[in-house]
Regions:
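Extended alpha-helical, oligomerization-prone segments that build pores/tubes and scaffolds
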Residues: 1-235
Length: 235
């Protein structure tokens, strides 16, 4: 029993460390702000993040300054304007067939993906040589204009795919079902990653919080919409 308690305590510490490293509480506050402002907040996690740390190591009596890279789980807030669930999902995105997430990344962030497991390093290098294909200005969620000339547009897909299509790109399914839950990443119209969904249930690594629920849709109603009628009465 004591050994089980000690193991559980060590695992709890490991989970807490991962949450702190990914600034989980800060991301949740940002997500709640989205909820109050526009009615919905989106959070993603857990998903793999490459983390780098510099430490001193004593090797044979000689101290060396080494750089360590690890893949750690993380969570983050997603801009609701960059998240596109299946329109037929109803009030829960997990009832839909797919989700799309759009990200704008710098060339440095793209280079960091080369060493991450599951990514096609050669396709990423080709995309870096091509440069960003997004050349027009884009509108931010707060209404301001943001230049995307130096940013790459990345699309992340989770959903049901034909088993034959997955096998064509080298992904073997675990049973004879005609469809399987998969994850794919597109960069500059290049397929840089395809793999089966790590969730056996086929659920997506996203959650949507609605400030005030609206029937038949995952998106909620924010504070400004809630007080519209009283504000009109006062005006």
């Amino acid at each position: 029993v004591e050994q089980a308690k000690q193991s559980a305590k060590l695992m709890q510490d490991e989970i807490d460390d991962c949450l702190k490293e990914s600034n989980f509480h800060g991301e949740m506050r940002h997500m709640i702000e989205d909820c109050a402002r526009i009615g919905s907040g989106v959070v993603k996690g857990p998903f793999p993040i490459k983390r780098t740390a510099k430490v001193f190591r004593d090797i044979g009596g000689v101290k060396e300054f080494v750089t360590l890279s690890e893949i750690k789980p993380g969570s983050k807030r997603i801009d609701p304007w960059n998240f596109f669930p299946d329109p037929a999902c109803g009030e829960s995105i997990h009832n839909g067939s797919y989700t799309w997430e759009r990200e704008y990344l710098s060339s440095r962030q793209i280079r960091e993906m080369i060493d991450m497991p599951g990514y096609d390093a050669q396709e990423i290098i080709y995309a870096l040589k091509e440069g960003p294909k997004v050349s027009q200005s884009r509108q931010a969620s707060d209404g301001s204009q943001q230049k995307a000339e130096e940013q790459f547009e990345l699309w992340i897909f989770y959903g049901q795919c034909d088993a034959d299509d997955l096998q064509a790109v080298g992904v073997e399914t675990e049973d004879e079902s005609p469809k399987a839950s998969a994850m794919a990443v597109m960069l500059n119209d290049r397929l840089v990653k395809v793999t089966l969904n790590v969730m056996d249930s086929g659920d997506f690594p996203y959650d949507v919080l609605a400030w005030q629920r609206r029937p038949s849709m995952p998106w909620g109603m924010g504070v400004s919409r809630q007080v519209r009628t009283p504000q009109r009465m006062l005006n």
